[in-house]
Amino acid sequence: MAHKTALISGITGQDGSYLAELLLDKGYKVYGVVRRLSAPNVWRIQHLLERITLLQADLLDQLSLIKVVEQSRPDEFYNLAAMSFVPSSWDQPMLTGEFNAQGVTRALEAVRSVNTKIKFYQASSSEMYGRVREVPQTETTPFYPRSPYGVSKVFGHYITVNYRESYGLFACSGILFNHESPRRGIEFVTRKVTDGVARIKLGLADKLMLGNRDACRDWGFAGDYVRAMWMMLQQPEPDDYVVATGEAHSVQELVEVAFAHAGLDWQKHVGVDPKFLRPAEVDHLIGNPQKARQKLGWQPEVAFKGLVTMMVDADLARLSAGQLIP
């Protein structure tokens, strides 16, 4: 069988790096999109650079996207690039919309213009549910986004559905609930906690300031979730899938597991800082992954506690080696 080719936008991010590893292991030729005019932040894919090809394009520039699709001639296009940090979407709502809404449209247009046989994956988000209409959430639960990020992702989701139905594209959206790893950005609460625990354990810090510790999320391992992305594009028909664990945990539980793993008493080190509270918090986000389990045969392999301890261990190792960032 001829080797497949994949194009990944957002390859320098958490999900992009795990997806690139997965596809390389499956024998794919992998192209990644990086934005021009900036030194790409490649620490997550440093170990892959000799095995992948990076191309310059920008979700804000239609012609650049068409060009990279023409250059790479992919069988599969995974659109993972986005402004993905929810709190900053309040600071930059217009730019968030440009990337996460119009950017998806430009990516789909590139596929439609170059080759309608390319299979397209869109990274949708549980943040689309926001003020949830039902618990747990499924593929048919109505969206009620509570941030500019969530709103932009709803647009990206529905424009993908529209291109599938209007142009017959093989276009899928994965409605991914929160997924973490040692490669998660330091600004996200899971990584903020595990990095904070490691710093306190090593004597580099004494306090960890957090916002709402009652906030609950359905957290899984990013390495498991990229497997679901790939599985979607191997199906006979395109469809949308919730990818989640089906379990919710609070930030408080995250704190307790992380501190306990490092042999620390969280109560001596954790404080509340109102500046980390969101203008509008989302409700009880728990995904129902039944469709993905039944139709794709997908199953998460890393449980919550294992995920948290994996991240604490990675941050301890990184800081012990003198790598303060990322």
Label every model-predicted segment.
Residues 1-179, 233, 302, 309, ...:
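N-terminal Rossmann-like NAD(P)+-binding domain of SDR-like oxidoreductases, especially those catalyzing
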Residues 25, 32-33, 57-60, 184-326:
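C-terminal substrate-binding subdomain of Rossmann-fold SDR/epimerase-dehydratase oxidoreductases
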